[in-house]
Amino acid sequence: MQMDSAQNQFNKRARLFEDPELKDAKVIYPSNPESTEPVNKGYGGSTAIQSFFKESKAEETPKVLKKRGRKKKNPNPEEVNSSTPGGDDSENRSKFYESASARKRTVTAEERERAVNAAKTFEPTNPYFRVVLRPSYLYRGCIMYLPSGFAEKYLSGISGFIKLQLGEKQWPVRCLYKAGRAKFSQGWYEFTLENNIGEGDVCVFELLRTRDFVLEVTAFRVNEYV
């Protein structure tokens, strides 16, 4: 009887290791070489079998840190195309060329001479200077250079906005003095445009005040002497 019981137990163990589902199982030996107790205790409460079916801990996947930042917004088509002909820049540009072409005249020598002679008859009591408006003063960057003699005497150290007065209205114009020369830049174009001052006209600039620095302008237009 004892032999039969041992044989049955052996057959059970043999079937266990012949099970196809456990064909990849490996026998685990104790990690301590001095230990003589086998880790595999067999079927039913066997630590070996339990180790095969023991739920393994899932490997932790490393967390990928996302870079924080603002998402790029899709550009507004209307904002992207703000420089198209419908935009303000294009409209201002077209106005500039229209006004420039309108003020660009075919001036004869006789007409120019008449305007210059008329300006010479006007002699203010305050310091003044005369300028015949050239195309470069009106169209190419809209910068006008002042006579060096007047600039050295009255504009030395000026670097900022002064006022040009024509009639009852004043316009701020940037004046820059450097190395004996002075020029009008920002605001000069608006002044000539609003007062319809064009090529060949003669302007007389009279110094009214040095504290706020106001220059009164008297314009002698060539079309008045045609």
From Swiss-Prot:
GO terms for molecular function: DNA binding. It is found in: Nucleus. A motif (Nuclear localization signal) lies at residues 70-73. Residues 15-26, 54-63 have a biased composition (Basic and acidic residues). InterPro entries: B3_DNA-bd (IPR003340), DNA-bd_pseudobarrel_sf (IPR015300), REM16-like (IPR044837). Residues 129-223 bind DNA. Interacts with XLG2. Interacts with ITN1. PANTHER family: B3 DOMAIN-CONTAINING PROTEIN OS01G0723500, B3 DOMAIN-CONTAINING PROTEIN OS11G0197600-RELATED. This is B3 domain-containing protein REM19. Residues 64-74 have a biased composition (Basic residues). Involved in the regulation of vernalization. Binds to DNA in vitro in a non-sequence-specific manner. XLG2 promotes the DNA binding activity of RTV1 specifically to promoter regions of FT and SOC1 in vivo and thus leads to the activation of floral integrator genes. Ubiquitous.
